[in-house]
C-alpha cells in the first residue's frame, strides 16, 4: 500500500478530486433492494424480540413463538415492545455525552488512516484505550460509592433498546441529510437511490466540526464501549439478585472484557479495516453499532442474569482458556495483516523473511494427496453402491 500523504497534501488533492463514486452493488437490483428492506424492517423488531425472549421467556424460542401465534405477529410485538422512558433517554444521552467528551478531550497520539478513494488521509486521535479505562473505572466507582446502581440499566434494558432503535434510526436520517447538504469531505456521494443511500450511507468519513469523527463515536466509543459496560452491568445485577456471581457469568464477562480490551488496544488498526476505510456511515454501520452491538453481542450475559449456570472450576477454566486462545488468534491475525501492509510485504514469518517454498513441499504434496484420495474413495463407493451411496451421502453429509 502506498505511504499515506500528509494531511495538507491530502487536503489539496481532495479539493481537486471529484466526489467519490457511490458504493456499487454486487447483486441484482431485486436482491439488493429486497435484502436492504428486509434488514431495515426486521432488525428493529428482532432486537426487542431477543430481549423479551432472554429476559421474560427464559430464553425459550418456543415460548416467544407461542406468544406471537396467540396474539398475532403485529399485536404480539406491540404487547412486548416497551415504550422509551425518560430514564432510558437519560441513560443513553448521559453515556453518549460522556463518551463524546472523552473522545474529544482525552490526549492521544495522532494517527493517519489509509488514503481514501478520493485521496484524503483521515486523521484520528488514538485515545480509545484511555477512554475505555476511564469509562470502566468511572462506572465501577459510581457503583462502589453508591452514586449510581448499574442494576438500573438492566431493569430498564427493554426501554433502552427501544429508545436506541428509534433514536438511532433518526440519527441515520440525520446522516443522510448531512451527506446531501454538508458532507465533511470529497469522500461522499449519492447513488441516486434513497434506499441505498440511507442503508449504505452518503459519507465515508462524516465529522462534526474538524475533530469529532462520527464513525469512531458510533462504532468504537458507543458500540464497543457499551458492550463492555453492559457485560459489567449483568455481572452486578446477578450479584445484587443472588448475593454471588456464577462462574458462567464470570467467564462470560471476563472473555467479553478481554475482547473489548483487545479492541481498544488495537483501535488504530481497526481504523484501517473495511468498517472504517470502506463502509460508509449509514444504517448498516451506524445503526448496527448503536443498537445491534449492545443488544445482540451482549445477549449471553443478558440471559445468564436470571439463569446462572454452575460450570465447576475445571470446565469454567477450560472455557476461559479456550476463549482467550481464540481472542489471541483473532488479534494475531489482525496484527500480521497490519504488519504486512506496514512493511509493504517485507515482513518476517516466524522470525525469518519469506524466501523459499520448497521446504514446505511435503505439506503441499500431502494436502493434494489426501484430497485426491478422498475423491477416489468417494468415486469407488459411488460406483460400487450406486443409488445407496447417494442415499448415504444425503444422510451423512460430513464423512471421514
Where are these regions (language model features)?
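Membrane-anchoring alpha-helices and their flanking helix-loop junctions
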Residues: 2-400
Amino acid at each position: 500500500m502506498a505511504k499515506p500523504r500528509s494531511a495538507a497534501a491530502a487536503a489539496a488533492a481532495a479539493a481537486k478530486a471529484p466526489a467519490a463514486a457511490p458504493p456499487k452493488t454486487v447483486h441484482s437490483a431485486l436482491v439488493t433492494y429486497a435484502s436492504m428492506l428486509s434488514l431495515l424492517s426486521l432488525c428493529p423488531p428482532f432486537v426487542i424480540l431477543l430481549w423479551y425472549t432472554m429476559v421474560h421467556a427464559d430464553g425459550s424460542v418456543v415460548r416467544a413463538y407461542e406468544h406471537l401465534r396467540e396474539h398475532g405477529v403485529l399485536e404480539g410485538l406491540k404487547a412486548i415492545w416497551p415504550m422509551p422512558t425518560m430514564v432510558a433517554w437519560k441513560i443513553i444521552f448521559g453515556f453518549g455525552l460522556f463518551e463524546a467528551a472523552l473522545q474529544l478531550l482525552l490526549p492521544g497520539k495522532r494517527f493517519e488512516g489509509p488514503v481514501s478513494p478520493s485521496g484524503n488521509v483521515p486523521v484520528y486521535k488514538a485515545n480509545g484505550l484511555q477512554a475505555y479505562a476511564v469509562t470502566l473505572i468511572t462506572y465501577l466507582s459510581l457503583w462502589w460509592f453508591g452514586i449510581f446502581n448499574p442494576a438500573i440499566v438492566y431493569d430498564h434494558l427493554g426501554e433502552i433498546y427501544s429508545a436506541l432503535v428509534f433514536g438511532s434510526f433518526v440519527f441515520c436520517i440525520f446522516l443522510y441529510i448531512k451527506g446531501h447538504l454538508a458532507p465533511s469531505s470529497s469522500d461522499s456521494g449519492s447513488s441516486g437511490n434513497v434506499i441505498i443511500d440511507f442503508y449504505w450511507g452518503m459519507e465515508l468519513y462524516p465529522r462534526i466540526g474538524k475533530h469529532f469523527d462520527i464513525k469512531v463515536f458510533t462504532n468504537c466509543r458507543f458500540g464497543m464501549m457499551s458492550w463492555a459496560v453492559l457485560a459489567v452491568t449483568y455481572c452486578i445485577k446477578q450479584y445484587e439478585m443472588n448475593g454471588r456471581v456464577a462462574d458462567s457469568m464470570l467467564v462470560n464477562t471476563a472473555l467479553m472484557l478481554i475482547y473489548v480490551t483487545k479492541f481498544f488496544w488495537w483501535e488504530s488498526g481497526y481504523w484501517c479495516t473495511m468498517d472504517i476505510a470502506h463502509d460508509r456511515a449509514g444504517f448498516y454501520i451506524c445503526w448496527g453499532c448503536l443498537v445491534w452491538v449492545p443488544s445482540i453481542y451482549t445477549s449471553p450475559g443478558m440471559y445468564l442474569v436470571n439463569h446462572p449456570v454452575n460450570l465447576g472450576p475445571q470446565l469454567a477454566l477450560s472455557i476461559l482458556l479456550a476463549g482467550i486462545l481464540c481472542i489471541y488468534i483473532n488479534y494475531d491475525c489482525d496484527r500480521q495483516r497490519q504488519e504486512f501492509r506496514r512493511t509493504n510485504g517485507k515482513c518476517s514469518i516466524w522470525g525469518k523473511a519469506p524466501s523459499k517454498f520448497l521446504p514446505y513441499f511435503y505439506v503441499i504434496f500431502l494436502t493434494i494427496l489426501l484430497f485426491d484420495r478422498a475423491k477416489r474413495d468417494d468415486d469407488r463407493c459411488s460406483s460400487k453402491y450406486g443409488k445407496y451411496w447417494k442415499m448415504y451421502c444425503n444422510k451423512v453429509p460430513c464423512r471421514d
